[in-house]
From Swiss-Prot:
This is Small ribosomal subunit protein eS1. Belongs to the eukaryotic ribosomal protein eS1 family. GO terms for molecular function: structural constituent of ribosome. GO terms for cellular component: ribonucleoprotein complex; ribosome. It comes from Methanoregula boonei (strain DSM 21154 / JCM 14090 / 6A8).
């Protein structure tokens, strides 16, 4: 009897839950990226959902870009998200590495004009092996270029520039004059959480 009652409670609990369809932000087309289940709407908010950029845009060439979104708003059975970061797959990164060349990683924190802090990891791939001074010059140029550009953009503009590859193209044009450069990729981004203001009352 105890087992039957326990099973009944499990069925009841499952029936009490609802499915919510999850969508990307407006600037990424409000694309459907999956479903999540919950018994209460409030427990849906804050959940992290992932999808490849290829799935979002129906472009198989972008399957190597993994996008992360946080559910920020729920209306009916629809859950709307905000972008929290992206990362390029390791297999794709390995395919970019060539012998007798350098991969130069650069970690940059930028602040957008709508006051969002974003950490970016950029990889610069050269045709030949660069020395320490050349690597330093490339990192400085990438950092200065990104920080200056980000101040003129809001978060949505920055995200669009990252996923479209436009920012990478701009950085490539900037650094190729300093050292023979094969490719520049923004391989990772993360939107930093801003702490709530502390009340002084």
């Amino acid at each position: 009897m105890a087992k039957k009652k326990q099973a009944g409670r499990r069925v009841e609990g499952w029936k009490a839950k609802s499915w919510f369809k999850v969508y990307t932000p407006d600037n990424l087309g409000k694309a459907y990226i999956g479903d999540t289940i919950a018994s209460e709407v409030e427990t849906v908010k804050g959940r992290i959902m992932q999808a490849t950029l290829g799935e979002i845009t129906n472009d198989y060439a972008k399957q190597h870009i993994k996008m992360s979104f946080k559910i920020a708003e729920v209306t009916g059975d629809a859950a709307y998200t905000e972008f929290v970061g992206h990362e390029v797959t390791r297999d794709y990164l390995r395919s970019l590495v060539k012998r007798r060349s350098s991969r130069i990683d650069c970690h940059v924190q930028v602040v957008t004009k709508d006051n969002k802090k974003v950490r970016l990891t950029i990889s610069c791939y050269t045709f030949a092996r660069a020395n320490i001074a050349q690597e330093h010059a490339l990192r400085n140029a990438i950092t200065a270029g990104l920080v200056a550009q980000a101040q003129a953009w809001d978060l949505n503009t920055l995200v669009n520039g990252v996923v479209s590859g436009e920012i990478s193209k701009d950085l490539f044009k900037l650094v190729k004059t300093l050292y023979p450069t094969r490719r520049v990729e923004i391989i990772k981004s993360k939107v930093e959480q801003v702490a709530a203001p502390v009340s002084t009352a």
